[in-house]
Amino acid sequence: TNKEVQDQSYNVVMDVVRRYDVDGVHFDDYFYPYGDGNFPDDDTWGEYQKSGGSLSREDWRRDAVNTFIERLYEGIKKEKPHVKFGISPFGIGRPGNPRSILGFDQYAILYADAHLWLKKGWIDYWSPQLYWPVNQIPQSFPVLLGWWSKENTMGRNLWPGMIIGGKTDEKGADEIINEIMIERGFVNDAPGHIHFSMRVFLKDSSALNAGLKAGPYQHQSLVPPSPWLDDVPPDPPRMSATVANDSTVLVTWSHENAKDVFRYVVYYQYEKNWEYTILNSQDRMAALPYSRTVIERARGRQRGDPAQPKVEYVIRVAVTAVDRVGNESAPAVQTMGRSVIPTLQ
């Protein structure tokens, strides 16, 4: 509620945005502190009343938080439109939303009107801290996720927060993987999620790490696009693919507007199946295995007959460019051994 404090906080964040090539600004737990409510704002509250302010003290505090959130979002977009702003609020909007949910009321106690920020679209991604298990009925992960998804009427990226501390054994890993698969089924286009915290992954958390690598994280993924920021994809790259030593496909590419590219994706097709690899903007070459051996059952064979190995070769290669907000270009495609440039299916 103190304007000088708000200005200083705003200026510090904007200084980082201006001077550094950041992807985004993240606020974790942005609200009044937990405690008994004795926040030391008597002076600014008195000044507000003397100036003719008509809000209750609770609404006045919430309004100060709302004003800062909106101001910061607009400031970031004016300075660098591609820099995302996201918040990770307490996971319960308010008790009773939806009806079965019980627990802490951040609106009344922390003066955080998180629901309003989402409704107004003052964020680019939304990561409510859904730190409760699937079967904890008063704070059920899927029930809360479904409610936030329904309330996301501005179509921002919904990336629920999942706590992984203390969940590194097999039982804990199953809980996290179940939450990920529920999120992928509940939320349109399965945009992703955020884990708290990275320290757990850096330790020897074999059950969790192994389960994620073998399950939901076995494939690379791109950050989802943010079409409200920009929905114009970059131009396709120029590419060439050649077979070297009958074992490797060497793919090279260039881009006329390389400064607009954040990632490249190289797709390659073995007969009917496409594979891909995601590379950084500085990369200009990829070496792909020209062949692979698969085991399949030949047509007409009976059950119990041994499966036969089959060698498949790369028949098409494609390269796309991805910009800072996640827009992917049309592909540049080459059919191996031919000069025809077909459409990527």
List PLM regions with ranges.
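Polysaccharide-binding and catalytic clefts of secreted carbohydrate-active enzymes
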Residues: 1-122, 131
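Substrate-binding cleft of secreted/luminal carbohydrate-active enzymes
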Residues: 111-137, 148-229
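Proline-enriched interdomain boundary motifs that mark the N-terminal boundary
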Residues: 231-240
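Conserved aromatic anchor
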Residues: 247-260
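Extracellular low-complexity, O-glycosylation-prone stalks/linkers
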Residues: 259-279
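Solvent-exposed serine/threonine-rich low-complexity stretches and specific carbohydrate-binding patches
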Residues: 276-289
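Beta-strand-rich modules
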Residues: 295-329
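Extracellular fibronectin type III
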Residues: 322-344
